[in-house]
């Protein structure tokens, strides 16, 4: 009976008996059952009320009788006693004995029970009441009074569900009549409207249901498939007298509303023509957030990480995070210049980190608001990743100390797919943050777009239903209802560690921004808004009428905050410069100097001792757990690794293993995430071993490398790029002493996460003075696999590099490291396992952090020539930005007729072609391993070595793609434009690659011919 399923759509009118008969009653999974009803050897036709259509009600009565025999009618008490004694159902029923003073009542009851139609009616009426209660629980929110303006229904539907009793004539839906309103009905165990009472008159049942579900709070929860959670919510919203606030709580709420409202009014007075995306119309957001934080702090949370869009951001910074007001006001001063490196960002995108005492709980709490772009909802997974990292570093495995709060706009919450992606990370083992509180500022409009044009679902919050998150809709002009809902939301998160949504149904008093005219597109709405009293005024009038505060106290509260703002404004006039670093959302204490500079500009050797290389190699080629049966094919792979270790060589997978394993020894936590990364898309990695005989028994050998090593997290992600890359970026924000890698299944698919790359990874430091060392591993290579499995689009990453192609960087002792410090990200395409090993280790050994983009190979993973010796990985070795020609051509450089620069896999095709043409002495091939920042110094050295050679850039990508457009101007700057730079590669194309194998091979043959035809460019200028 607890598992009834009722469609959420509006029911078509049915009679009560039809409704009852149409329901399928399932037995509860509870241990207590009334077996006599289920195992009968005698006919029971004499008692049709025991049939399946009524069994739900009978079982409800039985459970109530078990708990308290006096809670049911005497006839049921006798029936259950007899039935439990072994009587058949037909014989179990007896009329109750004389009750003396209640003889007439008893006679009436006996006659009713002896009359079979009346017994059926009694049962059907009780079942009808159960259905009525359930209807309110499921659909009561559809008629809740949620819109402060009284214009729209929050669910965009003015129809009232047929089973919600808004007038007495609708009782007929349940087969009830107005005369039944004063009849007393036993309450089922699935409701708490009775409080301590087990039965209520129908009139009172309806009144209490209306009060619980149809006032200023609408509760969506009946889609949740966990009975305990449903019961918990019912108790929170149905129990009588739940929404009681004492006078002190009301005064605190009023003071918070004063701060929220007067802050916006102060900004409007001082900077009336500035965009600030104010909170007018949803001022209750500030006390709402503070309530969630207060309640969570009381439950043990000491770190709250928040993400939000532009709407109300300055108010949140001022009154929730408690950013100094003068620093906020400085952002409005157009004359102040920022002293930090980078370009900065607008004030309503900036983040903040602050530790303070929570005055309600008297406990320390740290608040962080993550900086974000204008791309709505893009910060959602970033916040979740940062939250996960902070939980990881403090050992908070259940989310009891660190939590996330995400704020959303109604249009974006419904419209942006990243919301869905982020929700689906919420319960994944390696991505869960153990519950997020989502607060939707539902101002019922998206810029100029009506919600009826902006979503197909009744509410903007319907996406949350996919993860069984309860949704609490609340009228934002009822501050006490908002506070109650926020308390419940925080308590839900603390109790169940699951997501929850608070939908603040409000309005936007101004246009999209303060300069926008909303009357163009929403004239009727804004006529009503112009008449609408501010929530502060309404609530103040309420408290004054209740005697909680008087007019003088209210005005003093306003004056006190106005004075705070004026004094901060005066102090802001003394500021001479802006500091973006004051708005840092993720500080790294101790990593930089006090003024935020690297502690050195050198990078130590990235090599390892032979002993460490051998040890890691041995672990990588074994199973460090007893009685663990691995797949036969994997046994061959591990055996091959063992042979390589004996021969002191590594392939790509083993080089990666050694780089990561060595960092674990140094206390660096490593997290590798992405689709299929545990095994590797190309079945080369195998960092997680699976027992072939025991389901779900796994082993991660890399966590068995060293005593006291840092943990290694390798996790297959959901089939998402946008959400998962954002999550990993957020994880990398939390600490510089961790290596976070995200690998695309194929490099081609990274563009699904383009927003994270364009708005966070590439410009993050320039906008927010926030370094990040995330590593992107993007499998790339033209191998005849078609246009969607060939290219990681290197041209796009290179286009976004911030180095000047026409300017030679200033020479210095630390030229290479200085270049890395000045760049916005590092782009490499390694051609050897050893160089990949070094660049991964360098990422951590650098004294600062930059994103690293690695175009990783596919065919080279098993290429017999793509091997490196231990000698290339020993102490004193390092990452080679260029690998110069080392063959016969280097022995007679003046005789070399062509110098080919290339990068990545194409090198092996070039060397094979050169060998086949017997041109080793005529053509030198140099590999540019680090594309950005461009190695001007080493390229110059290589060019000067071959004075008689013409210069060719060769790539396997099409001419309008790949590296050519980036490399050519930098090569020309390197040689001071003394020679032309020729191109050998595929012709320009719209698609990254052909899908035809023959065409692929024809293109390959053509550009290899061009590369080695020494007369190919004669006559060209």
UniProtKB/Swiss-Prot annotation:
InterPro entries: 2-oxogl_dehyd_N (IPR032106), 2oxoglutarate_DH_E1 (IPR011603), DH_E1 (IPR001017), KGD_C_sf (IPR042179), ODO-1/KGD_C (IPR031717), THDP-binding (IPR029061), Transketolase-like_Pyr-bd (IPR005475)
Tissue: Expressed in the brain.
Catalytic activity: N(6)-[(R)-lipoyl]-L-lysyl-[protein] + 2-oxoglutarate + H(+) = N(6)-[(R)-S(8)-succinyldihydrolipoyl]-L-lysyl-[protein] + CO2
Enzyme Commission number: 1.2.4.2
Broad class of where this protein is predominantly found: mitochondrion
Keyword Calcium assigned: yes
Keywords in alphabetical order: Calcium, Glycolysis, Isopeptide bond, Magnesium, Metal-binding, Mitochondrion, Nucleus, Oxidoreductase, Thiamine pyrophosphate, Transit peptide, Ubl conjugation
Residues that hold Mg(2+) according to the record: 410, 443, 445
Gene Ontology annotations of biological process type: 2-oxoglutarate metabolic process; glycolytic process; succinyl-CoA metabolic process; tricarboxylic acid cycle
Binding residues for Ca(2+): 142, 155, 157
Subcellular location field: Mitochondrion; Nucleus
Pfam families associated with the record: 2-oxogl_dehyd_N, E1_dh, OxoGdeHyase_C, Transket_pyr
Regulation: Calcium ions and ADP stimulate, whereas ATP and NADH reduce catalytic activity.
Annotated family: Belongs to the alpha-ketoglutarate dehydrogenase family.
Biological function: 2-oxoglutarate dehydrogenase (E1o) component of the 2-oxoglutarate dehydrogenase complex (OGDHC). Participates in the first step, rate limiting for the overall conversion of 2-oxoglutarate to succinyl-CoA and CO(2) catalyzed by the whole OGDHC. Catalyzes the irreversible decarboxylation of 2-oxoglutarate (alpha-ketoglutarate) via the thiamine diphosphate (ThDP) cofactor and subsequent transfer of the decarboxylated acyl intermediate on an oxidized dihydrolipoyl group that is covalently amidated to the E2 enzyme (dihydrolipoyllysine-residue succinyltransferase or DLST).
Name of protein: 2-oxoglutarate dehydrogenase complex component E1
Organism expressing this protein natively: Xenopus laevis
Recorded name of the encoding gene: ogdh
């Amino acid at each position: 009976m607890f598992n009834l399923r009722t469609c959420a759509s509006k029911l078509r009118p049915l009679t009560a008996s039809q409704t009852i008969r149409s329901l399928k009653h399932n037995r509860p999974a509870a241990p207590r059952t009334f077996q006599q009803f289920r195992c009968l050897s005698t006919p029971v036709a004499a008692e049709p009320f025991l049939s399946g259509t009524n069994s739900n009600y009978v079982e409800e009565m039985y459970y109530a009788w078990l708990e308290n025999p006096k809670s049911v009618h005497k006839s049921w008490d006798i029936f259950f006693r007899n039935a439990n004694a072994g009587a058949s159902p037909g014989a179990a029923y007896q009329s109750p004995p004389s009750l003396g003073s209640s003889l007439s009542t008893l006679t009436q009851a006996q006659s009713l029970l002896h009359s079979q139609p009346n017994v059926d009616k009694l049962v059907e009426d009780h079942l009808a009441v159960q259905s009525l209660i359930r209807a309110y629980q499921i659909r009561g929110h559809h008629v809740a009074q949620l819109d402060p303006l009284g214009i729209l229904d929050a669910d965009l539907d003015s129809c009232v569900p047929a089973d919600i009793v808004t007038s007495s004539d609708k009782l007929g839906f349940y087969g009830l009549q107005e005369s039944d309103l004063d009849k007393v009905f036993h309450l089922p165990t699935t409701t708490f409207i009775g409080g301590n009472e087990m039965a209520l008159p129908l009139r009172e049942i309806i009144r209490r249901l209306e009060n619980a579900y149809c006032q200023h709070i609408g509760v969506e929860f009946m889609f949740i498939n966990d009975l305990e959670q449903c019961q918990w919510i019912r108790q929170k919203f149905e129990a009588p007298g739940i929404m009681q606030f004492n006078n002190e709580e009301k005064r605190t709420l009023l003071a918070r509303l004063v701060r929220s409202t007067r802050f916006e009014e102060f900004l409007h007075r001082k900077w009336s023509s500035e965009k600030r995306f104010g909170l007018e119309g949803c001022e209750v957001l500030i006390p709402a957030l503070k309530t969630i934080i207060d309640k969570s702090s009381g439950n043990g949370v000491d770190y709250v990480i928040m993400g939000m869009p532009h709407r109300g951001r300055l108010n949140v910074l001022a009154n929730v995070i408690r950013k100094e007001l003068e620093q906020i006001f400085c952002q409005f001063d157009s004359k102040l210049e920022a002293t930090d490196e980078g370009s900065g960002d607008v004030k309503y995108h900036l983040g903040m980190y602050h530790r303070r005492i929570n005055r309600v709980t008297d406990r320390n709490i740290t608040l962080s608001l993550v900086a974000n772009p204008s791309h709505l909802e893009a910060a959602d997974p970033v916040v979740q990743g940062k939250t996960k990292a902070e939980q990881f570093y403090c050992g908070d495995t259940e989310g009891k100390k660190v939590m996330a709060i995400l704020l959303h706009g109604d249009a974006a919450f419904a419209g942006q797919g990243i919301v869905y992606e982020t929700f689906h990370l919420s319960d994944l083992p390696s991505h869960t943050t153990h519950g997020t509180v989502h607060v939707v500022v539902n101002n019922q409009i998206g810029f100029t777009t009506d919600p009826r044009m902006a979503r197909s679902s009744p509410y903007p919050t319907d996406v949350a239903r996919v993860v069984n998150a309860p949704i609490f809709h609340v009228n934002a002009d009822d501050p006490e209802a908002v506070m109650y809902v926020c308390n419940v939301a925080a308590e839900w998160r603390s109790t169940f560690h699951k997501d929850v949504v608070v939908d603040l149904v409000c309005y936007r008093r101004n246009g999209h921004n303060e300069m926008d005219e909303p009357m163009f597109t929403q004239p009727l709405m804004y006529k009503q808004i112009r008449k609408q009293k501010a929530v502060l005024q309404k609530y103040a009038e309420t408290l004054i009428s209740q005697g909680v505060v008087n007019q003088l106290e209210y005005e003093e509260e306003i004056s006190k905050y106005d004075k705070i703002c004026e004094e901060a404004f005066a102090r802001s006039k003394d500021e001479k410069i802006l500091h973006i670093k004051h708005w840092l959302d993720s500080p790294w204490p101790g990593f930089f100097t006090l003024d935020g500079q690297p502690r050195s500009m050198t990078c130590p050797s990235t090599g390892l001792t032979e002993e460490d290389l051998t040890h890691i190699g041995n672990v990588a080629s074994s199973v460090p757990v007893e009685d663990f049966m691995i797949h036969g094919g994997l046994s061959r792979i591990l055996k091959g690794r063992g042979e390589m270790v004996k021969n002191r060589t590594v392939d790509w997978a083993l080089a990666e293993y050694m780089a990561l394993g060595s960092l674990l020894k140094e206390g660096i936590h490593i997290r590798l995430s992405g689709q299929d990364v545990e095994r590797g898309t190309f079945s080369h990695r195998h960092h997680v071993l699976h027992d072939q005989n025991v389901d779900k028994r796994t082993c991660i050998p890399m966590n068995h490398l060293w005593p006291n090593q840092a943990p290694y997290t390798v996790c297959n992600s959901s089939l998402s790029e946008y959400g998962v890359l954002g999550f990993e970026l957020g994880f990398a924000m939390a600490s510089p002493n961790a290596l976070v890698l995200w690998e695309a299944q194929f490099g081609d698919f990274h563009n699904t996460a383009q927003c994270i790359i364009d708005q966070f990874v590439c410009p993050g430091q320039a906008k927010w003075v926030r370094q990040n060392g995330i590593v992107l591993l993007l499998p790339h290579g033209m191998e005849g696999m078609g246009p969607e499995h060939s290219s990681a689009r290197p041209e796009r990453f290179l286009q976004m590099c911030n180095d000047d192609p026409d300017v030679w960087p200033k020479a210095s002792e630390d030229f290479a490291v200085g270049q890395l410090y000045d760049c916005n990200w590092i782009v490499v395409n390694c051609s050897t396992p050893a160089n990949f090993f070094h660049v991964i280790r360098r990422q951590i050994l650098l004294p600062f952090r930059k994103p690293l983009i690695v175009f990783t190979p596919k065919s080279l993973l098993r290429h017999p020539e793509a091997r490196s010796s231990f000698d290339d990985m020993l102490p004193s070795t390092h990452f080679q930005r260029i690998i110069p020609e080392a063959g016969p051509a280097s022995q007679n450089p003046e005789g070399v007729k062509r110098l080919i620069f290339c990068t990545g896999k194409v090198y092996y095709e070039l060397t094979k072609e050169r060998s086949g043409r017997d041109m080793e002495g005529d053509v030198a091939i140099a590999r540019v391993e680090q594309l950005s920042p461009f190695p001007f110094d080493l390229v110059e050295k290589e060019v000067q070595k071959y004075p008689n050679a013409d210069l060719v850039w060769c790539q396997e990508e099409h001419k309008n793609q790949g590296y050519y457009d980036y490399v050519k101007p930098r090569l020309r700057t390197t040689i001071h434009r003394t020679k032309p730079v020729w191109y050998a590669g595929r012709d320009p194309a719209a698609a990254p690659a052909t899908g035809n194998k023959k065409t692929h091979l024809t293109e390959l043959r053509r550009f290899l011919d061009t590369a080695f035809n020494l007369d190919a460019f004669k006559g060209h200028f």
